[in-house]
A protein has these predicted regions:
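Active-site microenvironments that recognize anionic phosphate/pyrophosphate groups
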Residues: 1-230
Length: 231
């Protein structure tokens, strides 16, 4: 039942510090609205200790597709709807930056970046469960050992997706997949949703840059620093 899965997700969000207890009712109502429900689950929700929200999200995504909230046959729409769900359980950009700066000032930069990385995992922006399915091996070459990885978080496009992309009118927003206007973007068939995406401002040589983690993790704690202006 969708309402029960919503309660499971709220429990996960609370235990992982995504949603404060004071914000739980607001988050619950936002999720109920997203799924077209008028009331929450009335029973007790069993206590769980989940590392990742994948199982809950899969159940909610299956239910959302059945309700016609998105085309379940198109993987990109499924991934985009997942970001929409988790975006309702995240602190806003300003709150993320405030927490990051507070941790950096009180406990140092490692504590701040560790918190930010965990936030990206807990919100499934970094798709850790899928990354664990990556196929990886080493092979010897004349230049030394080469590590090869087949990244399972970026599946090949299916024929329906390719056909829909051809019908999609060109859009110049966001300018690229790294620009800061990606924060909270709903996505489209040829552009990933970023409602569960946050960035941290950093100053380098007196200029404004931003720090983010890569959702695909080509190497451990793969991060990206980009300029405030698209260049």
């Amino acid at each position: 039942e969708i309402a029960y899965q919503i309660e499971r997700l709220l429990q996960f969000a609370q235990k992982h510090g995504l949603v404060d207890e004071l914000d739980t009712i607001y988050a619950r109502n936002a999720l109920l609205d997203l799924f077209g429900l008028e009331a929450p689950f009335a029973g007790e929700c069993a206590q769980e200790s989940l590392t990742y929200p994948t199982e809950i999200l899969d159940a909610l995504l299956d239910a959302g597709a059945e309700k016609g909230l998105f085309d379940g046959e198109v993987n990109q729409f499924r991934v985009n709807f997942e970001a929409r769900i988790m975006g309702l359980l995240m602190p806003r950009e300003s709150e993320c930056c405030r927490i990051f700066e507070q941790l950096r000032a009180q406990q140092g930069p490692k504590a701040a970046t560790d918190w930010f990385y965990k936030l990206c995992i807990d919100t499934n922006y970094i798709r850790t469960a899928q990354i664990a399915q990556n196929i990886q091996w080493n092979t010897a070459t004349e230049y030394g050992d080469l590590e090869i990885t087949i990244n399972m978080t970026k599946p090949e496009k299916d024929p329906k997706t390719i056909a829909l992309e051809r019908l999609q009118p060109k859009a110049g927003y966001p300018t690229c997949m790294l620009c800061r206007e990606n924060i909270g973007y709903a996505g489209r068939i040829n552009f990933p949703a970023r409602q569960n995406h946050r960035i941290i401002p950093v100053t380098l040589s007196g200029d404004q840059f931003y720090l983010q983690y890569s959702p695909y993790v080509y190497f451990n704690e793969h991060c990206i620093v980009f300029h405030k202006d698209h260049k």
